[in-house]
């Protein structure tokens, strides 16, 4: 088997590593750098430039130099409004609704995976030059909070680059592998990963070569780019006050400001102030204008404090989801170039009550971890097991608009969960399966990832057909859903790849609303279930009453019919307490039918029961979509 390379496909920079003689090695690129700028440019001659050479000409070619493309991976055009404002190149809506880049120098609209593939190709060629052999397989990392579409887009980029992506690994998990490869004792670590475009926090338990993720959280719209953007906005504002000239619409000036902002941010990690000098930034009737400004660390920290604070809540949630206290964490590992910012290191200390561990290189740890995972897959790295998780719950919509969760968030992957449903109406021949992602009890308050229809179900009374719905999340975190009519064997499958990236507000809403409205959701769900139970009992009782009407007394029959009528009236009034009490009354009144059914069954099937074992009545009132739950696979 050939080498499987490990690639950190970053927002700002990318890095490639391999396992060599049992040790991970970071490979230098052709320019001598251990990391490569994730930048792709097209010259006016149509030539493609990748990495540092692309970065070198970005000021003079802003509209055809693509950076931070990771922010657009797997996202719909409507979801990237804030990102569009941060880049000088043109983002358009693709035919399928996704975000595309219009590159004027080659008169072409390109997808984010196509552009990312250029960076991956550079990483592939870097590894091939070092190894002296062809490379066809890779492990590529993604932010832990990347959704299914973003993961799929990353796999697509690998395929375009000529790589078979053997595994998609979450970045914090990869960093933990890099940290723990030589650790023998058990410990709990937190990985705080603030990169160029995304933020992740993961809590892991390490011990005996097992790396088990306990929880993960994050924000796919928060990273170093946002810190740069705050400096840019401040410089534009100050320059406008001084010269009455607005630089915000000058793309070449913006590119120079971007470069200067990034440089100042880096400088302020080690100094108390940074000088920004941009001669000939623009010109007016009076001649050329120069931008000169001194940015202090105190002013910078004031400007970005709201961004720093945004990392706190995900950390607290991850600790809570792991069932731990901050004091239980043995080490906090910092990953991503933005963690060099002193204000970030301070908030990490405030959250976890300890100084962060600086033993891993924040720029290289993720690629090293990816290489280790590659070694695990080839068998070169032995006695190491990686257990990752899915970041958000997955389920389907059931009767009354309820979300029935099949896989809870922070479930270890790969995993497969199944549940058996049935039809909600007599002679129903198809069901519409709506696949949801989120934490709320009601379907409408979660995100629809996709839907599909299972048809060809034989006409039968409701509750009779058995439809098994299965959710399968592979080791890459990619979701597959299937529905199977257990009577006919007919099956329908879907791989969720039509979904796009969750926006910052959507992720925030899913989790925050779930906590804020937990009681409200619980009550609403209980009310719907009470109505479903009542309706199901009425249906079953009326059906049995017809079947056994001749075998029960007229008095019992009248009593049962009276209770059915009363329960129907309470359903019309939507009085939940009355519905519950009258449901109990009808259940008690219908015991007479149950007695008749049992007596009849005992007489007619005595011989059959001796041969096949006791017949159990497993009919069960349950949740209904276009169907109701009749069984559950408790894996």
From Swiss-Prot:
Family, as annotated: Belongs to the heat shock protein 70 family.
Organism the protein comes from: Borreliella burgdorferi (strain ATCC 35210 / DSM 4680 / CIP 102532 / B31) (Borrelia burgdorferi)
UniProt lineage: Bacteria, Pseudomonadati, Spirochaetota, Spirochaetia, Spirochaetales
Induction comment: By heat shock.
Bias (Basic and acidic residues): 620-635
Function: Acts as a chaperone.
Example of a GO MF term: ATP binding
Biased composition (Low complexity): 601-612
The protein, known as: Chaperone protein DnaK
Residues with the Phosphothreonine modification: 198
Recorded name of the encoding gene: dnaK
């Amino acid at each position: 088997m050939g080498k499987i390379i490990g690639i950190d496909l970053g927002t700002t920079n990318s890095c490639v590593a391999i396992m060599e003689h049992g040790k991970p090695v970071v490979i230098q690129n052709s320019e001598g750098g251990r990391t490569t700028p994730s930048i792709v440019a097209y010259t006016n001659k149509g030539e493609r430039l990748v990495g540092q050479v692309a970065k070198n000409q970005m000021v003079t070619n802003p509209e055809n130099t693509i950076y931070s493309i990771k922010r657009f991976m797997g996202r719909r055009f409507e979801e990237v409004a804030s990102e569009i404002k941060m880049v000088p190149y043109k983002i358009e809506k693709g035919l399928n609704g996704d975000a595309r880049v219009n590159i004027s120098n080659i008169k072409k609209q390109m997808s984010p995976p196509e552009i990312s593939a250029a960076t991956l190709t550079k990483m592939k060629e870097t590894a091939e030059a070092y190894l002296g052999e062809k490379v066809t397989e890779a492990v590529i990392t993604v932010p832990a909070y990347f959704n299914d579409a973003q993961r799929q887009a990353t796999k697509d980029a690998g395929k375009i680059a000529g790589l078979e992506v053997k595994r998609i690994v979450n970045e914090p998990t990869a960093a933990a592998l890099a940290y723990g490869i030589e650790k023998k004792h058990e410990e709990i670590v937190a990985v705080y990963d603030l990169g160029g475009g995304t933020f992740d926090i993961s809590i892991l338990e390490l011990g005996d070569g097992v790396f088990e993720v306990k929880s993960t959280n994050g924000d796919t719209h928060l990273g170093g780019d946002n810190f740069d953007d705050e400096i840019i906005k401040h410089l534009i504002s100050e320059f406008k006050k001084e010269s009455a000239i607005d630089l915000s619409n000058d793309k070449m000036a913006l590119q120079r400001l971007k470069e200067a902002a990034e440089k100042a941010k880096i400088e302020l990690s080690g100094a108390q102030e940074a000088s920004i000098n941009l001669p000939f930034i623009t010109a007016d009737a009076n001649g050329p204008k120069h931008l000169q400004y001194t940015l202090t660390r105190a002013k910078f920290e004031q400007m970005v404090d709201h961004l720093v604070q945004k990392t706190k809540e995900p950390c607290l949630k991850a600790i809570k989801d792991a069932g731990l206290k901050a004091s239980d964490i043995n080490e906090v590992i910092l990953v991503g170039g933005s963690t060099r910012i002193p204000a970030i290191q301070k908030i990490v200390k405030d959250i976890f009550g300890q100084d962060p561990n600086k033993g891993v290189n924040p720029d290289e740890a993720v690629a090293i971890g990816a290489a280790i995972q590659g070694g695990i897959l080839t068998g070169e790295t032995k006695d190491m097991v990686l257990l990752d998780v899915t970041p958000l719950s997955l389920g389907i919509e059931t009767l009354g608009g309820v979300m029935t969760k099949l896989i809870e968030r922070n479930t270890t992957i790969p995993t497969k969960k199944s549940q058996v449903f049935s039809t909600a109406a007599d002679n129903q021949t198809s069901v519409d399966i709506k696949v949801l992602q989120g934490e709320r009890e009601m379907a409408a308050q979660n995100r629809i990832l996709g839907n599909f229809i299972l048809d060809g179900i034989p006409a039968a009374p409701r509750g009779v057909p058995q439809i098994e719905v299965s959710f399968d999340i592979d080791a890459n975190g990619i979701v597959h859903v299937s529905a199977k009519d257990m009577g006919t064997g007919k099956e329908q499958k879907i791989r969720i790849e039509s979904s796009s990236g969750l926006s910052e507000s959507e992720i925030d809403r899913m989790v925050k609303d779930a906590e804020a409205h937990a009681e409200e959701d619980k009550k609403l769900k209980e009310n719907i279930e009470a109505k479903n139970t009542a309706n199901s009992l009425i249906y079953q009782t009326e059906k049995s009453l017809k079947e056994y009407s001749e075998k029960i007394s007229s008095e019992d029959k009248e009593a049962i019919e009276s209770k059915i009528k009363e329960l129907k009236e309470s359903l019309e009034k939507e009085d939940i307490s009355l519905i519950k009490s009258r449901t109990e009354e009808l259940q008690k009144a219908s015991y007479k039918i149950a007695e008749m059914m049992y007596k009849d069954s005992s007489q007619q099937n005595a011989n059959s029961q001796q041969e096949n074992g006791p017949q159990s009545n497993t009919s069960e009132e349950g949740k209904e979509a276009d169907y109701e739950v009749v069984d559950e696979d408790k894996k």
